[in-house]
Curated annotation (Swiss-Prot):
Localization per Swiss-Prot or TrEMBL: Secreted
Sequence similarity: Belongs to the apolipoprotein C2 family.
Major localisation: secreted
Region (Lipid binding) residue spans: 63-71
Gene name of the encoded protein: Apoc2
Entry superkingdom: Eukaryota
Protein name in the entry: Apolipoprotein C-II
GO molecular function terms attached to this record: lipase inhibitor activity; lipid binding; lipoprotein lipase activator activity; phospholipase activator activity; phospholipase binding
Magnesium found in the keyword field: no
UniProt source species: Mus musculus (Mouse)
The protein's role, per its UniProt record: Component of chylomicrons, very low-density lipoproteins (VLDL), low-density lipoproteins (LDL), and high-density lipoproteins (HDL) in plasma. Plays an important role in lipoprotein metabolism as an activator of lipoprotein lipase.
Gene Ontology CC: chylomicron; cytosol; extracellular region; intermediate-density lipoprotein particle; low-density lipoprotein particle; spherical high-density lipoprotein particle; very-low-density lipoprotein particle
Tissue expression from the record: Adult and fetal liver, intestine and peritoneal macrophages.
Amino acid sequence: MGSRFFLALFLVILMLGNEVQGNQEDDSGSLALLGTVQGSLLSYWTSAKEVAKDLYQKTYPISMDEKLRDMYSKSSAAMSTYAGIFTDQLLTLLRGE
């Protein structure tokens, strides 16, 4: 998300810089260069997004799913153990033994 902010800020500064310069001669070479730079930045951003998305989809379901299942089984086993101990203590207290 930070990269999007910096890219947007860069484009806003670029547009403000063009407004400050006023109506000077439009050099078709500079416009072509600007279009090329914008196109390459957009293609780089799109490819980086796709690579990150693919990497996330490859790594998340395998490792994170196993870790979450393991944490759930360990925590539910611990909770059932402590619930049993609490129940035994409560019954002993109520019976008065």
